[in-house]
Design a protein with these regions (language model features):
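Short active-site loop at a secondary-structure junction
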Residues: 39, 64-124, 163-171, 234-237, ...
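Catalytic loop of the DD-peptidase/beta-lactamase superfamily, centered on the K-T-G motif
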Residues: 1-56, 227-328
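Short, flexible, mixed-charge acidic loops at enzyme active sites
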Residues: 54-61, 218-224
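Short, surface-exposed loop or secondary-structure junction motifs
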Residues: 115-283
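Bimodal feature
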Residues: 25, 46-51, 69, 114, ...
Length: 328
């Protein structure tokens, strides 16, 4: 519990969101969250033994006053790392990759450009224990991120390692960019195709896509950045999915049904994740004590503000509502 003194250092909007009386229903909490300044949000809840529940509030499109739709596509950003980690695990079980092989084994040309390439293993990259700097931490990357996203390694070449391999932890998007490149190289075709064949098709995830070029933009929730009028829907940020598709995948990840025999035992990564790109923030969580998956999509971001912290408070309150309703 925070002390009164420590609350002086917490922005009032976060204190308010935290101390408000807990509503009785998830929809009331969604409506309350919109009152905190979010443009729009979607919630998907999968409680074991119950049909999935969908909630939405605010705007799908602010300019045209189109209400949020729980079936809209959303840019899931780093939640996609879970799909990559599962794919790497499957390829290791198939003996097409090895967790113990190094970055230099797969890409010798990176020796001298990425420090410790000869010592960094695939498993270290999966677990963010490689020490490879995060290209999105480089301010120059964001000066033209749509173009720079096509060549992210240029923003980490010749930088010092954050730490010696396997001697620390630092979340780095570079790890997963490299893992996707390694999958592409080993397979001779795209990691997206592999994910589709081995994860999306078996789980019947028909509303998960890899690019805005694969879908009708009208099906995508608009994305906003605080203080900017622009809708970021047309920016390319990789994977898109409905909240339901993410929820089905997360359930399969946690109950093991996404894996074939012998794969879950060697899976080395997380079982839930968040995602954040301009205009889109997402959280996908599994709560074992109530056997419930909760997916939250919010289409308002501010990298210098409190929107991410606020989103975490909101999902925590939603989980508490579900937990309280289970116990009554």
């Amino acid at each position: 519990m925070a002390s009164i003194g420590s609350l002086y250092f917490v922005p009032w909007i976060l204190v308010k969101a935290w101390i408000l009386p807990l509503p009785d229903t998830v929809q009331e909490q969604v409506n309350e969250a919109i009152g905190h300044g979010f443009d729009g949000m979607i919630i998907y809840v999968d409680e074991a033994g119950k049909p999935p529940a969908f909630y939405a509030g605010g705007w799908n499109n602010r300019e045209n006053k189109i209400p949020a739709n729980p079936k809209s596509l959303f840019k899931i950003a780093s939640i996609s790392k879970l799909y990559v980690a599962v794919s790497v695990t499957k390829l290791v079980k198939e003996k097409r990759l090895s967790f113990d092989k190094t970055l230099a084994d797969y890409f010798p040309e990176l020796v001298g450009k990425i420090e410790n390439a000869e010592e960094i293993t695939l498993k270290m990259m999966v677990q963010h224990r490689s020490g490879i700097p995060n290209f999105t931490d480089n301010p120059a990357y964001w000066e033209n991120e749509q173009e720079n996203g096509k060549k992210p390694l240029e923003f980490v070449f010749n930088l010092p390692a954050s730490f010696e391999p396997d001697k620390g932890y630092e979340y780095s998007n570079t790890n997963y960019y490299l893992l996707c490149e390694i999958i592409d190289e080993v397979l001779g075709y795209s990691h997206q195709q592999y994910i589709k064949e081995r994860i999306l098709v078996p789980l019947e995830l028909n509303n998960t896509f890899f690019s805005i070029n694969d879908i009708n933009l009208d099906d995508v929730m608009s994305g906003y950045y605080v203080g900017i009028e622009k809708d970021f829907k047309a920016n390319e940020y990789g994977m898109l999915a409905t909240a339901e598709d993410v929820g089905i995948f997360l359930r399969a990840l946690n109950d093991g049904s996404v894996f074939n025999e012998g794969e879950q035992e060697i899976y080395p990564y997380e079982y839930e994740h968040g995602g954040l790109v301009i205009g889109y923030q997402s959280l996908a969580e599994y709560h074992e004590d109530i056997d419930t998956v909760v997916v939250q999509f919010i289409n308002t971001t501010d990298f210098n503000g409190y929107e991410w912290n606020l989103s975490e408070i909101v999902i925590n309150r939603i989980v508490k509502i579900i937990r309280d309703n289970k116990s009554t």
